[in-house]
Amino acid sequence: MLPSQSPAIFTVSRLNQTVRLLLEHEIGQVWISGEISNFTQPASGHWYFTLKDDNAQVRCAMFRNSNRRVTFRPQHGQQVLVRANITLYEPRGDYQIIVESMQPAGEGLLQQKYEQLKAKLQAEGLFDQQLKKPLPSPAHCVGVITSKTGAALHDILHVLKRRDPSLPVIIYPTAVQGDDAPGQIVRAIELANKRNECDVLIVGRGGGSLEDLWSFNDERVARAIFASRIPVVSAVGHETDVTIADFIADLRAPTPSAAAEMVSRNQQELLRQIQSVQQRLGMAMDYFLANRTRRLTLLHHRLQQQHPQLRLARQQTALERLQQRMNLAIDSQIKRTNKRQVRLLQRLNQQNPQPRIHRVQSRIQHLEHRLAEHVHSRLSAMRERFGNAVTHLEAVSPLSTLARGYSVTTVTDGKVLKKVKQVKTGDVMTTRLEDGWVKSEVKGITSAKRAQKKKPD
């Protein structure tokens, strides 16, 4: 009989550590799908939330260095798909998962892809309204790209038949759902452009979920619509369904039936318009004829008034009056000219310039004589004043003083030597004489004593 073995005894810490290691090493990394609840983000930047389904829930943590790579903001109730490691928080014994990556699940993922493609194409300018092509008015041939068995085609054909039965319609059948649908739609658009049979295209399908309409959110379809030379009207789903094709197309219709109305003419309305135009044209013609008749009568009357014989007679009378006025004007001008000529001759005789010229010449000679005397007198006076000034200037000139035996001595800085304190033994001085300069060196200095004045008693 084998001796009984005592059971292993764990401490709480060791138990939690053992469980954590088992979870982390045995299970490893897993993918989990669930719904987010209790989402929080404290100041640390980490995300804490609960991932649940109908029957269970688990606590989750996603640290900041991982969650900053997530391209969307998680919302309460959102279905997500996460890649995570299973672990145990040892201090409390709480089982939790550490999320490494997160992406929307199901339609959430499709919506994320939709927003990313929309932002990309918008940045490239494919949504620019200035690039939209105008629809022909009226359309002479309509091309329809949709499923040949779908309700959308039935609605389009029904509306076109009701509004404009004579309008040609060319159908380019294609799948509108499934993996092959985007490629078929692209080929149908390219085929319509290659054949160039239509002047407008309707591209669309009936309503459905986001996944059902996903072919019209495909980048290939969007670029094919943008590259189409033929204007494209998008007619995808219902009015609330908005796809990438709606943004790219030259015009968006809320439904396939609305698209058919946009590209077609209402024959009943056209008939009413034609009848209205005919009525207005008849009234305009009646008014035009009546107006022309009145003008013709007026012109006939004016023509009678403007008969050539009458016009010639009036012109002749006017010419005779003008000739008479011209003759009178010429005679009057000749008489005025003769009278003026006589007056000018009389004034000329009265204003003989010879005596006046003699008087002016005599006055000029007298003025010239007086001017010569005045100039001579002024010159004599100025010469006398100049001689006196020269004599006075020579009398006070330093050169005259030097000529009498005096001299002027300057020290090295060029100042005149006035006192013995300006020099010292060894200084060189310059003495100015009448006929030159003498440089000398100071050998000694002797101050002269001034005689002091006695104060009165």
Swiss-Prot record:
Keyword Cytoplasm in the entry? The reply is yes
E.C. numbers: 3.1.11.6
Query: What are the BP-aspect GO terms?
Result: DNA catabolic process
Q: Which UniProt keywords apply?
A: Cytoplasm, Exonuclease, Hydrolase, Nuclease
Q: Which GO terms describe its molecular function?
A: exodeoxyribonuclease VII activity; nucleic acid binding
User: InterPro entries annotated for this entry?
Assistant: Exonuc_VII_L, Exonuc_VII_lsu_C, OB-fold_nuc-bd_dom
Q: Where is the signal peptide?
A: none
Q: Where in the chain are disulfide-linked cysteines found?
A: none
List locations, semicolon-separated. Answer: Cytoplasm
Recorded GO CC terms: cytoplasm; exodeoxyribonuclease VII complex
Catalytic activity field: Exonucleolytic cleavage in either 5'- to 3'- or 3'- to 5'-direction to yield nucleoside 5'-phosphates
Source superkingdom: Bacteria
Q: Which family does it belong to?
A: Belongs to the XseA family.
Assembly notes: Heterooligomer composed of large and small subunits.
Among PANTHER family, the record links this protein to: EXODEOXYRIBONUCLEASE 7 LARGE SUBUNIT
Task: Summarize the protein's role.
Answer: Bidirectionally degrades single-stranded DNA into large acid-insoluble oligonucleotides, which are then degraded further into small acid-soluble oligonucleotides.
What is the name listed in the Swiss-Prot or TrEMBL entry for this protein? Exodeoxyribonuclease 7 large subunit
The species this protein belongs to is Escherichia coli O127:H6 (strain E2348/69 / EPEC)
